[in-house]
Regions:
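N-terminal intrinsically disordered/low-complexity leader segments
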Residues: 1-16
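Generic hydrophobic, amphipathic alpha-helix propensity
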Residues: 14-25, 42, 67-71, 75, ...
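Helix-turn-helix
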Residues: 20, 28-62, 66
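Short amphipathic alpha-helical elements of helix-turn-helix/winged-helix folds
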Residues: 24-28, 98, 102, 165
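Hydrophobic alpha-helical connector segments
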Residues: 66, 77-105, 159-162, 183
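Amphipathic alpha-helical packing segments from all-alpha helical-bundle domains
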Residues: 73-76, 80, 120-146, 153-164, ...
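Amphipathic alpha-helical segments used for helix-helix packing
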Residues: 100-122, 171-175
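Hydrophobic/aromatic-rich alpha-helical bundle segments in the mid-to-C-terminal region
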Residues: 114-115, 145-190
């Protein structure tokens, strides 16, 4: 019988390479700023050809969008491990505190460019927005188990409000050059506000 424990599919290899390119771009972004990096610089540092870059990303801006894909792979694990057994308000606060910590690790320059009104992935009305989808799921599950939202509130409205608040936290953190602990700030603000949102 063959041992498949070290077997890598083409998709797995492509994902690894895409993450490598993203991480190289992120390092360069932290060193010299997003506006100062070029695709050629990324390729040189990553040890790949420009053709290989374009096989994985359509543009420099597309690298920013990969943040979302990268984060999504961690979301379900966070839900399963960190939120299990918590009350709904605690789940929502813990999830967004995690998002803020994950985002802060990417650096100020990344945040300024990704969390921009020009970035269509940040449109809170997009149906596929994973953060809203996750918080909706948490709220709907809690409601099925007897949690009652305030009159006139829906899971989507709560999720959208939370998402907008967190984007505001990220914007403020970026405007202040990352001078404070974003996750800690989010913990305090969301803990104070969560009751009014539900």
């Amino acid at each position: 019988m063959m041992d498949y424990t070290n077997f890598e599919t083409k998709d797995m290899k492509n994902r690894k390479l895409k993450e490598h390119i993203f991480n190289v771009a992120l390092t360069l972004m932290k060193q010299i700023g997003y506006d100062n990096i070029t695709i050629r610089m990324i390729c040189t540092e990553a040890g790949i050809s420009t053709g290989m870059f374009y096989k994985h990303f359509s543009s420099k801006e597309d690298i920013l969008a990969f943040y979302y894909d990268k984060a999504q792979s961690d979301f379900d694990e966070v839900i399963d491990k960190q939120l299990a057994g918590l009350s709904l308000p605690q789940q929502l606060v813990a999830f967004y505190v995690w998002v803020c910590g994950f985002t802060a690790d990417l650096g100020v320059d990344f945040c300024r460019n990704f969390f921009s009104s020009k970035n269509q992935r940040m449109n809170t009305n997009l149906f596929h927005n994973k953060m809203i989808e996750i918080t909706n799921r948490c709220i709907e599950t809690a409601c099925e188990k007897g949690f009652q939202l305030s009159s006139g509130r829906t899971p989507y409205a709560v999720s959208k409000d939370l998402c907008v608040m967190v984007k505001g936290i990220i914007f403020d953190w970026s405007a202040h050059e990352g001078s404070y602990d974003m996750a800690e700030f989010a913990q305090g603000l969301l803990s104070r506000c969560i009751g009014g949102l539900l």
